[in-house]
């Protein structure tokens, strides 16, 4: 990021948390690259439409897509700021243990394009220690 330019933001996970976050950041004038593993979600967003129920989000997404500030893809792209907003469902162990595998997979993908000075934000609901584990996974790359 240079001087007075807006940071480029990459939001990983375009569901109930990620898509509104991406749209609001884009409304502020930052170019946003949204990432989702589901191609139909990507295609829907790139048409300026939404795949979730959220009051007034449809108009906001349409506006920022039309302005060229929000683009979606299935691949992570270099950015100045990364927001990880992927699911953390319960594992199928019967103990309600959070499954952080989506977070760790996203962190490993971010590590592939991360450069000095970038910021990584974990927005996903996660148990204590997940941020440190994510940091360690990124540092190991």
How would you describe each model-predicted region?
Residues 90-141:
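Rossmann-like NAD(P)(H) cofactor-binding subdomain of soluble oxidoreductases
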Residues 18-19:
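N-terminal Rossmann-fold NAD(P) dinucleotide-binding loop
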């Amino acid at each position: 990021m240079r001087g007075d330019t807006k940071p480029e933001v990459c939001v990983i996970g375009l569901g109930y948390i990620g898509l509104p976050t991406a749209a609001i950041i884009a409304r502020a004038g930052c170019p946003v690259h949204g990432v989702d593993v589901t191609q139909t979600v990507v295609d829907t967003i790139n048409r300026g439409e939404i795949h979730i129920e959220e009051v007034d989000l449809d108009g906001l997404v349409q506006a920022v897509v039309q302005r060229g500030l929000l683009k979606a893809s299935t691949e992570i792209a270099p950015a100045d700021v990364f927001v990880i907003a992927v699911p953390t469902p319960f594992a199928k162990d019967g103990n309600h243990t959070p499954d952080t595998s989506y977070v760790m997979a996203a962190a490993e993908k971010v590590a592939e394009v991360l450069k000095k000075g970038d910021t990584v934000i974990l927005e996903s609901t996660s148990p204590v220690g997940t941020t440190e584990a994510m940091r360690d996974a990124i540092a190991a790359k």
